[in-house]
Amino acid sequence: MKWKTLASIACATPLLYACGGGSDAPQAPVVRLCPASLDYTTTFTGGAGSGELVRLQLDTTKLTWQVTYVESPIPATTGTVSPTRAGTSQTGTLTMETGLPTQKLNQCAYQLNGATLDPTRPARIFVGEGVAGGTIPGKELQFGGVLGQGVVPDRTFPYYPFIGFSTLETNLANVAGTYNQLGYHEIPSQSYARIAVDSKITINADGTWQECDNSGVNAGKCQQAGSNFTQSPDGSGAFVTNNFLGQGTPTLALGPLGKGYMIVGKLNGQNVPILIRTGTANATITTGIPPFADDESGISMLSPQTAIALNSVNGEYVGVDNAFDYRTTAIAGTQATLIDPFQPSQVALSRALNLDYTQSIAGLVTSTVVGASTGATPTGKFIFSGGVFGYLDQSNPTTPYYTIGSFVQ
């Protein structure tokens, strides 16, 4: 298939550029892409790439934000592994975005002042109807280990990718079904090893479930990868599974000690399950528990194993990838383009894809990076639900690429 030029794709997608000739015709009123106002009575509950279960609140009149870490593997203090920032909150002020191409887009995007650890990379939130995505405050991680084990190299994350929903499905019977799962995890105590999440998950109404992994240390196995899903006691509306198997081997533990939290957003009449793995570590023996490290953490998305029709998911989506870059994804038929929405003309920052809707597994659209050294061999996978997609590419198996995007227009 001959790939369209980036310029022609851009002109077809108003999020990225304004193209064509002028006109004196009256302009139709701008249709908002998000609520005209928000306050703290609306809470976006969701997951972060850090493995955190988060509540985000915005007040677009007072221009303030608040992030509450309900569950977290991220240490509260650099140089330690516990306690984490679970149960704590951060606050700050908002600035409406001005760097997007149109007012329609800027009025639904905000910078979270004080949230980033790198002033050249602002933390931003993009708001839609019932969904908010972007980034939440980052953290500098470092730990010297215990007797040479569990060392976490010094690294500063300016922010973490996040997606959350204003309405959740809290009845597990309504979540039961078979899903494709795509995501990524990182293991800080293994030099931040990045691991793909690629599996099939079947969830039953009684909380029992099964995961069949296509990658990771459990590739080829089908098993219940944690305790039965139940309502999390933290009151977040999420479901929890204990002793949740990771995609890698724990650094210092005989078995899985991390937890899984499934946040099921309700969006456009569909469920959008986000499954995070929240790792854990203990560096002391004062509690009578020996030191341990099962700090693999991350995020994934689930979507039903239901066939996706060609052209049914066309449109523009916005999100953040696991390289901590903001991404607009324009999908048109069998082609997709990922572009930096703040620098849309920079071709070097873009990624062009060919999509294949054959779907040997229902609901799993494969993709090929145009011009990649892998040629026409599919290295990527897309899943879709409720106007949200998850995209995993393993062109380089040691550094899988992942992003979640939500529909804009």
List each language-model region with its residue ranges.
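C-terminal motif of bacterial Sec signal peptides marking the signal peptidase cleavage site
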Residues: 15-18
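Mature soluble binding/inhibitory domains
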Residues: 21-409
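Bacterial N-terminal signal peptides that target proteins for export
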Residues: 1-7
